[in-house]
Amino acid sequence: MGNNKFNYKNDNRLKLTILIFICIIFIGIVGFFSTINAQNQQQPEITNINNYKDTTLETNIFKLLKKIFSITGVYAFCFEKKQVIEQNDDGSFSIYKVAGWQKFLMILIGLVLIYLGAVKNFEPLLLLPIAFGTILVNTPIAGIGEAPHGFLYIIFNAGIRNEIFPLIIFMGIGALTDFGPLIANPKLAILGAAAQFGIFGSLVGAICLNLIPGITFTLKDACAISIIGGADGPTSIYVASKLAPGLLGSIAVAAYSYMALVPLIQPPIMRLLTTKKERLIRMENTREVSKTEKIIFPLIVLLLCILFIPSATPLLGALTFGNFLKEIGIVERLSRTMQNELLNIVTIFLGLGVGMQMSAHKFMQAKSLGILAIGLVAFILGTAGGILFAKFLNIFSKKKINPLIGSAGVSAVPMAARVSNKIGIEEDPTNFLLMHAMGPNVAGVIGSAIAAGIMIAFFG
C-alpha cells in the first residue's frame, strides 16, 4: 500500500514537472517570435485593406528554419569553408580555410581507424583514441581542436608539443620489459641494431620523394618519417614532435598501423629471405639471468647513453628508469602504477592528442601518401636487415642463429617476437623461438631510441 502511495505521488510530481516544462517551452517560443517580430516591424503603409496580406510570420519562420539549418553539421559539410585557427611553434597563430567536405572525409578516415582497431584488433589501445581524436577535431563549428581553448588543443599542447607523453609511455614500456633474454645472449643486440637499417635506408627514400611534383620534404621531415622503420610508436611521435610537428598525425598513424600489421607484413619477407633449413635451426636454451644482472643492466645502458649519445637520454632515461623500478623490487607500487594506471591514462591522452593533428588541412596532402609509402619501405627494410644480418653472423659462428629471430629486431614488442616464434613453429612444432626472439626485440627498442637520438643531435 505504501509503495502505491509513493508511486502515486511520484506520478503526480512527474506530470507537474512535464506541465511546467511544456509551459516554459511555450513561453520561450512566444517570446522568441515576439522579439523577431519587434525587430522586423516597419512603419505601416497605407494600403487597401482588401488587398492586404500579412507575410511577417511566414518570413520569420523561413528565417528561423534557415538559421537552424545553418548551425547543423550538414550545412557545414556541404556549404561552409571555415577558418581554422592554429598556433605555430613560435607562439604565433595561423588561419587556414578548410572546406566542409574535407572535414567529412577525415571523419570517414576516423571511422576506418575505429574499424581497424575495434573489429580487426589492430593496436586498439592507441588506434581507437586516435580515431576519436580525428573525428572530434574535424567536427565543424565546435572548435574542439582550435587554439587556444579547444580541449584537444589543450591536450596536445600539454603533453605532445612538449614531448612529455611519449616519455611517460617509455617509462611504462620499461616497467613492462624483461631484458633477461638480451642479457643472457648479448650478441643478439647486434640483430636489434641491424634492424635499424630500415630507418637510415628510408631516410634516403624520403629525400628522393622530393623528385615527385607536389611533395616537398625537408631533411628534418625525412628524418621524422624514416623513424617509422623502427616500428616504435612513442619514438616516432617523439622525433616527429621535435623535427616535423606538422607531420605528426600522419607519422603516428603510419607507425602504429604498421606495428599492428606486423603479423601480415613480416611473414612473407621472412619466408622469402630464409630457406627451410634455416627456419629449422634450433637454438640452445638461454642461461638463467640473476637478479643482480637485471638490476645493473638498465644503469649500465643509461651511463653509456649519457657518455656517448646524450641526445638519446630522454628516451632511454625514461625506459631504464621504468625498468630499474621493476627489477629493484622495493617500489612495487610505483612499478605497478607505471605499468597500469599511468601508462593507460597517458595512452588515452596521447591518442587524442595525435588525433588532433589529423585535421583536414594537415592530412589531406600528397605528403601523407608519401609518408605511408616510405613508412612501409622503412619497415620492410628493417625486417630484412635483421634477417640478413643473422644469416651473415651464421657464416662465422659455430652456434647458429635462426634467422627468423632477426626480424624481431624491430621495436614492435612483443608482436615481432611472437611472429618469429609462430613461423618457427609452423616449420617445427617443437622449435620454440619466443625467448630467443625477445633478445633482439628489446634490443630494437634501445636501438630505435639511439637512432632517434642521433637524428635529433644532427638535425634537431
Where are the regions that the model predicts?
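Hydrophobic transmembrane alpha-helices of secondary-active transporters
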Residues: 113, 136, 162-183, 322-325, ...
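Alpha-helical membrane segments and immediately flanking helix-loop junctions
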Residues: 157, 161-162, 171-179, 191-201, ...
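Transmembrane helical segments that form the transport core of multi-pass membrane transport proteins
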Residues: 50, 54, 302-386
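Flexible hinge motifs at transmembrane-helix junctions and intramembrane kinks/re-entrant loops
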Residues: 114-128, 212, 265, 304-317, ...
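Low-complexity, proline/glycine-enriched hydrophobic segments characteristic of transmembrane helices
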Residues: 28-99
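Entry/N-cap segments of selected transmembrane alpha helices
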Residues: 182-203, 360-386, 437-441
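Alpha-helical transmembrane segments
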Residues: 246-264, 374-382, 405
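Membrane-embedded hairpin module used as a gating/binding unit in multi-pass transport
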Residues: 254-330
